[in-house]
Curated annotation (Swiss-Prot):
One GO CC term on file: adherens junction
Segments on the Cytoplasmic side according to the record's topology features: 629-785
Purpose: Cadherins are calcium-dependent cell adhesion proteins. They preferentially interact with themselves in a homophilic manner in connecting cells; cadherins may thus contribute to the sorting of heterogeneous cell types.
InterPro entries in the cross-refs: Cadherin, Cadherin-like_dom, Cadherin-like_sf, Cadherin_CS, Cadherin_Y-type_LIR, Catenin-bd_sf
Chief location: membrane
Membrane topology reported for the UniProt record: Single-pass type I membrane protein
UniProt protein name: Cadherin-7
Short name of any one Pfam family annotated for the protein: Cadherin
GO molecular function ontology, one term from the record: beta-catenin binding
Coiled coil region boundaries: none
Domain comment as written in the entry: Three calcium ions are usually bound at the interface of each cadherin domain and rigidify the connections, imparting a strong curvature to the full-length ectodomain.
TM region positions: 608-628
Gene Ontology BP terms: adherens junction organization; calcium-dependent cell-cell adhesion via plasma membrane cell adhesion molecules; cell migration; cell morphogenesis; cell-cell adhesion; cell-cell adhesion mediated by cadherin; cell-cell junction assembly; homophilic cell adhesion via plasma membrane adhesion molecules
Gene field: CDH7
Amino acid sequence: MKLGKVEFCHFLQLIALFLCFSGMSQAELSRSRSKPYFQSGRSRTKRSWVWNQFFVLEEYMGSDPLYVGKLHSDVDKGDGSIKYILSGEGASSIFIIDENTGDIHATKRLDREEQAYYTLRAQALDRLTNKPVEPESEFVIKIQDINDNEPKFLDGPYTAGVPEMSPVGTSVVQVTATDADDPTYGNSARVVYSILQGQPYFSVEPKTGVIKTALPNMDREAKDQYLLVIQAKDMVGQNGGLSGTTSVTVTLTDVNDNPPRFPRRSYQYNVPESLPVASVVARIKAADADIGANAEMEYKIVDGDGLGIFKISVDKETQEGIITIQKELDFEAKTSYTLRIEAANKDADPRFLSLGPFSDTTTVKIIVEDVDEPPVFSSPLYPMEVSEATQVGNIIGTVAAHDPDSSNSPVRYSIDRNTDLERYFNIDANSGVITTAKSLDRETNAIHNITVLAMESQNPSQVGRGYVAITILDINDNAPEFAMDYETTVCENAQPGQVIQKISAVDKDEPSNGHQFYFSLTTDATNNHNFSLKDNKDNTASILTRRNGFRRQEQSVYYLPIFIVDSGSPSLSSTNTLTIRVCDCDADGVAQTCNAEAYVLPAGLSTGALIAILACVLTLLVLILLIVTMRRRKKEPLIFDEERDIRENIVRYDDEGGGEEDTEAFDMAALRNLNVIRDTKTRRDVTPEIQFLSRPAFKSIPDNVIFREFIWERLKEADVDPGAPPYDSLQTYAFEGNGSVAESLSSLDSISSNSDQNYDYLSDWGPRFKRLADMYGTGQESLYS
């Protein structure tokens, strides 16, 4: 017969009660009180409480209140005169007392894990007087534990790690289960551990919960993780005990127990010879089953003919060996290289050296492929020299380039004109001879840096570049001149022999031995009585006065011509003029005032020449002003003089209609007399938008005013006339002269069907008027009807 959990708990309760009551010596204890109790004021009687030791089983599930124990006083005679009351923790709510008998019962289910004991107070009262017959006494009701809580792993699930290849018995992790039952009573809280899943790899200590390895040489590379299930069971693991489980994930951590190995014994790679230095040729990798730091590699080239051409480094992320170029490759020099490369772990574990050497080697063969390379010059830079006096077409030097490929294609030369914009030089396309194409000037450009292009004849896209530095050698082709525009002063009170100016010269040429200049006065100025020149022999000269008594009123400016010769071969010379102004000076020789009248020494311009130049300049200015004035002159407005008549003249005017053929003279008096044109013709069936005021009488006014008034009147008539042009209508004009024989061709005349005009005569005027005759001749009337 199987018992359920509830029945099993009741069974345990009965056993516990039996043990409790059998262990008591008749279960009742008497306690004498030394405290006296007074009755009726004078007599003293000793009283004492008597009660059971109270124990209550937890988790009582019965329908009736659970009997706890009985309170009894020596005073109680059993006649009902004593009343018992209960106070303290759980009184009335959990625990009740029979006031007549003193029996205590529990009315609710108790849980020791919530509260292990209750402290209460009991008192016996006289039922009639309701006064205490015994002092209040405190007692404890202890909750008796039963095995109603299973062990629990409060820290689970667990994760742990252990190095692979660990020996048997290596500690992995400790698990701990707790049981809420009373550890001081029975075996309800005594837990033992066992492993339900994870054997035969791991084991667990039953009492401590320490998990250990159970198999040797567990290999992470074969299996790196294990899931264990650990059980904790109370009642020392006996049947009927409660249990709890947890999971433990054990990861094998890596150790360096696998040496690196290349997947292949040899590798081969093809690279073009044009691959730049530092380019990657190949990547190789030695396999290592380990991970992390145990798989870190070191690569090196241990042998081969490419030790100085290639190098190998390691990629920290992928642990690959990277082979790169250290020097330029040349197919024509060497077509292949062989490298012996070793890979080794950075840190080897001495415990596993017996597994073999923790390094491996492989062979890498690198094949250099030929590419079509541009021509190569024999020198990276060609320095050349040429005199600036050399003739056009002279040879300066020669450059040479060749095709480095095995085909050795012929080379053609040219100059990169971006480096020779002025085209000073030419080059022979076949020989590479450089010649001058223009005259050279060192003072303009002393060094020409040009780029020569060399192209293969068979493949012009392959271009090599050579650099030529042409230095222009100097010749004496520039005359010396003043270092600056000199202008000095001489005081009126200057003494003879006084130095008034020190001059120097410059020369654009650069002789190898330096400049040497010679100064003197020109032949015309040598015999002047005012100034002299002293050559200081150090490329300078001093100007001195020959006399005293200079007067500004007599001569305010002197022009002294100075002759300068250089030391070149052949030597060159120039004449430069020094301006000397006569000034009024103070006592210290500082100039105060000077004027600008000039007295020219024999070597300068004459006074007559200066006057002639000034006259020419003045005449030119007058002509320019006259031209500007003529161009800016505006036309005067047209004003008719009353005494002037324009008859017998052709008058040009604008007309929006057809032109008038009548050029016969007419009388201006008709226009001047405005009385004949004052009747404003307005349409009676249309109310004009502009109401005209009464016009005053007109006086005699100028002709231009007459024309303006006439046009203004006609403009107002047109503004108020809805039938005004662009519609054809009859217009009234002032007298314009007598009619011509050919009659008028004005477009303003009516060509309606009511017109009596006849244009048949136009056909008699010849072919020039044929088109006009077709438009206005016979038969046209129907077109306009």
